[in-house]
Swiss-Prot record:
Site (Important for catalytic activity): H233
EC numbers on record: 3.5.4.2
Catalytic activity, as annotated: adenine + H2O + H(+) = hypoxanthine + NH4(+)
Record: residues binding Zn(2+): H19, H21, H209, D290
GO cellular component labels: cytosol; nucleus
Role: Catalyzes the hydrolytic deamination of adenine to hypoxanthine. Plays an important role in the purine salvage pathway and in nitrogen catabolism. Also exhibits a low activity towards N(6)-substituted adenines that are commonly known as the plant hormones cytokinins.
Originating organism: Schizosaccharomyces pombe (strain 972 / ATCC 24843)
Required cofactor(s): Zn(2+)
Name of protein: Adenine deaminase
Swiss-Prot/TrEMBL keywords: Cytoplasm, Hydrolase, Metal-binding, Nucleotide metabolism, Nucleus, Zinc
Gene Ontology molecular function terms on file: adenine deaminase activity; zinc ion binding
Domain of life of the organism encoding this protein: Eukaryota
Record-stated family: Belongs to the metallo-dependent hydrolases superfamily. Adenosine and AMP deaminases family. Adenine deaminase type 2 subfamily.
PANTHER family: ADENINE DEAMINASE
Length: 367
């Protein structure tokens, strides 16, 4: 099926990523490689850590977000030096580039590392070096988004924010904005109202996870109390029609993560995601991979999953692609470049499907 013309179009479509956690790109192979390099002992009482293959297999059995987070926090313990963080991010950028991602806005969790004695400087210098390499090697534009862990006290978020301000990371463009992640339920957005207010006063961009496992009130609180400019996940927005209308009218982009929602059992099937409802309501959204090392797919696999279950038209894909570009935290010039690339892709696809099919192609389509 992935050989059908529409899938080739999706493969070539210029993509923007807005919801990927760099720590969630830590593949089992890289976990074992860095553990050996840095002398880190992985849990001996868990058979999952026998080999990279057994670790990968264990990722098939997540029951909820917290199940996943357990493996996630063990894996990041292998990240010690700046070169480790650079290797991790560059591995993601390489894969993303191969799948047609032209612009990537990536999350990182400094508190995960500073809490275990790794300095903020080490984390950011490694990730920013990978961003520079991605631009140089692939022509990819990138943004780092610094996330606060919502299961930690808000005071910890203030400390992390102060560290970034001290380094002038927002002013010099090394960090493009702030986000809010980790366990959602029982940690509503309003707990972080003060630090987000400080960010807003300084003109720093703001996003946050809401409406993944939490109900629509988490989304509303994020908008009202944190002045969020984007909503990460947001699939439960569909349960509140008035709020959905507001999000559409205010052009608040959602960053959806289909395979993640399936793996963490937020939905029982990709077909349950409110893709049609969002398209019909004019809610802008992008499609993203979240934590691809754990959830069985990077950006393209998520795009294909949506196509398989919703059979979108080229026009609908153009809406998604353009919404992703316009919702990106990039210059107007860069947006124009990417929008032009989408139109070029559409023209090439239109010309391709208007050509007479060869016998081989016809047989392939029938199959």
């Amino acid at each position: 099926m992935s050989n059908l013309p529409i899938y080739n179009f999706i493969r070539k479509l210029p993509k923007c990523e807005h919801h990927v956690h760099l720590e969630g790109c830590l593949s089992p192979d890289l976990v074992f490689r860095l553990a050996k390099k840095n002398g880190i002992t992985l849990p001996s009482d868990d058979a999952a850590y026998t080999t990279p293959s057994t670790l990968l297999a264990s990722y098939e059995h997540f029951g909820c977000l917290d199940d996943f987070l357990r493996y996630y926090y063990i894996a990041v313990s292998v990240l010690i030096e700046a070169s480790d963080f650079e290797a991790l991010a560059y591995e993601y950028f390489s894969i993303a580039h191969s799948q047609g991602v032209h612009h990537a806005e990536v999350f990182f969790d400094p508190q995960t590392h500073t809490s275990r004695g790794i300095s903020y400087d080490v984390v950011v210098s490694g990730f920013s070096a990978a961003c520079e390499r991605a631009n140089r090697d692939f022509g990819m534009s990138t943004n780092l988004i610094m996330c606060f862990l919502r299961h930690l006290p808000s005071e910890a978020a203030h400390e992390t924010f102060a560290e970034a301000l001290k380094r002038n990371d927002f002013e010099n463009g090394i960090v493009a904005g702030v986000g809010l992640d980790s366990s959602e339920v029982d940690f509503p957005p309003e707990l972080f109202q003060e630090v987000y207010k400080l960010a807003a006063e300084k003109g720093i961009r703001r996003t946050g996870h809401a409406g993944e496992e939490g109900d629509p009130s988490y989304i509303r609180s994020g908008l009202d109390n944190l002045s969020l400019q984007r909503i990460d996940h947001g699939i439960r927005l569909v349960e509140d029609k008035e709020l959905m209308k507001r999000v559409a009218e205010e052009n608040i982009m959602l960053t959806m993560c289909p395979l993640s929602n399936l793996k963490l059992r937020c939905v029982n099937s990709i077909a349950e995601l409110p893709v049609r409802e969002f398209l019909e309501a004019g809610v802008p959204f992008s499609i993203n991979c979240d934590d691809p090392a754990y959830f069985g797919g990077y950006t393209l696999e998520n795009y294909f999953a949506i196509q398989k279950h919703f059979n979108l038209t080229v026009k609908e894909w153009v809406f998604i692609a353009n919404a992703a570009i316009n919702g990106s935290w990039i210059s107007g010039k860069r947006k124009e470049e990417l929008l032009s690339s989408v139109q070029k892709c559409v023209k090439e696809y239109t010309a391709e499907i208007q050509q007479p099919k060869t016998l081989e192609t016809a047989v392939e389509v029938q199959a």
